[in-house]
């Protein structure tokens, strides 16, 4: 009886470790895997898909605070955005757009509207949507 239990545990251990080491390209396994965005990401180099994220330990307190404010549930709220801008000023980077009344959607041209649409979708922070928004912004500056 001990041999059967021991063999079963050994078998489950080997199987689970094999599953754990398998790398999965999630873009091949979603419901809309045929969508162009998933096809582009799936065909991308594995290094680009499985890249390493920056570690919080390697960031200073302002970078950590910026990430914390941006990733909160209500991170787009005015208070959080002001805190992000404050931390960016403390870091010395002036990448924050000036605060002022934004242009209405009706006053924007087609590329501006497309960039805004890509960024404000449910998954607007995903790579393909960000890439498309940047492409539309490049079209703005080019023409």
UniProtKB/Swiss-Prot annotation:
What is the species listed in this Swiss-Prot or TrEMBL entry?
Salmonella typhimurium
One GO CC term on file: periplasmic space
Q: What does induction of this protein depend on?
A: By silver.
Where does this protein reside within or beyond the cell?
A: Periplasm
Q: What is this protein's name?
A: Silver-binding protein SilE
Where are its TM segments located?
none
This protein's gene is called silE
Q: What is its main location?
A: periplasm
Q: Where is the signal peptide?
A: 1-20
- Keywords for the protein's UniProt record, in alphabetical order: Metal-binding, Periplasm, Plasmid, Signal
